[in-house]
Amino acid sequence: MSKPMNKGVSRSGKPGKISYVSRKVGALIEEMVRQADIVPGEDMIVHDSSMWVDWADRGILAIGESYMERKWDSPHVDQVMAKLAAMPSEKKRKLFRSWKTRLLLSIAILFNQQRRAKELEVVEKHYDLGNEFFRSWLDKNMQYSCGCWKGVATLDEAQFAKMRMIGEKLKLKPGMTVLDIGCGWGGLGRFLIKEYGAKVTGINISKEQIRWCRNTAIAEGLQDSFHSLNQSYRDLEGKWDRIVAVGMIEHVVPKNYQEFFDICKRCLANDGLMFLQTIGANISKEVLNDRWLTRYIFPGGALPSIAQIAKAAEKKLIMEDFQNLGPDYDKTLMAWHSNFTKVKDDLQMSDLFIRMWEFYLLYCASGFRERKSQLWQFVFTKRSKECYDFE
């Protein structure tokens, strides 16, 4: 699993002896990994054993960064991360129960040479990667959200099924107006126009994505039915028969949830329906409690809990329907990773970025697999006097 632990590599790159404390703490963390049923030399190959102390100090941030820096490898990163996530807390507590162990851990963390004052320099940033990057590994409709895998086998089919499910849950009829908040590259909007005869307004704060929406709508002859705007949801005016927001509220911090639902209520017709799809957290928090994801993938992001969504919608909208598709996001992320693996050598991205993106997709897949993360779909109305029925 790892190289002999009597030698290490300092931050400067010069070889040197690892201290007694670091060796002891490193051995403890390695034992914790073994107790998570991670097979030495098979599930995980360690190239630099100095990372163990950093794992003890900075947790997931160090785990992700050490993978990015090639300090460890695995043929199945998703399985390694899933096993670590599934490890019972009691097992971890037993390893660190004695006062001597806790003292050694404290000393090792105090003198951790792997600590950084700032993030690794990944030149390519998540939302500045360009349309062609995402086009190379997403489905043909460029859906950057969870697909629906019931009865289907491919990513294209899963994303088509997801869009069909949204259309059915919205109970769309020809001529209805739809507001798509955070419309991405417009794939859902174009689908609702072609399949249901809807009139769609899509908003997005990304200029590049809006340009893509407009050009694609023109290319498909849908420009009269698809109106795309480069603006924030805060600037919305008007009313729509239906509102849809897929993978958008994750970028609205909890303190602004109330405002978001106030705006949705104002923009929704009295007899309208609103569909919301979001990644969800099991516990209410004000910020995304994951230092690696916050630093490298979703700065400023947050995952709402059911309680936070319900509280924000209270006295504004009525929750009519709820569904959890969490396990389907595991399948979606693994399909994305499979596609990404096929094209990564042609992307002309840095090695640090490639490994960051691989870890992002596989780490997130493990979270859904172990049910640490959820994928929720909500349907809301203003004041419908009929029972909502979806089959």
Question: Model-found features: residue ranges?
Answer:
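Feature captures hydrophobic
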Residues: M1-F160, M165
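Conserved SAM-binding strand-loop segment of SAM-dependent methyltransferases
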Residues: E220-Y233
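A short acidic, Gly/Pro-enriched loop at the edge of an enzyme's catalytic core
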Residues: R234-I243
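A short glycine-rich, Lys/Arg-flanked "PGG" loop and its adjoining helix->strand segment in the class I
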Residues: Q258-N270
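Conserved beta-strand signature within the Rossmann-like core of class I S-adenosyl-L-methionine
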Residues: D271-I279
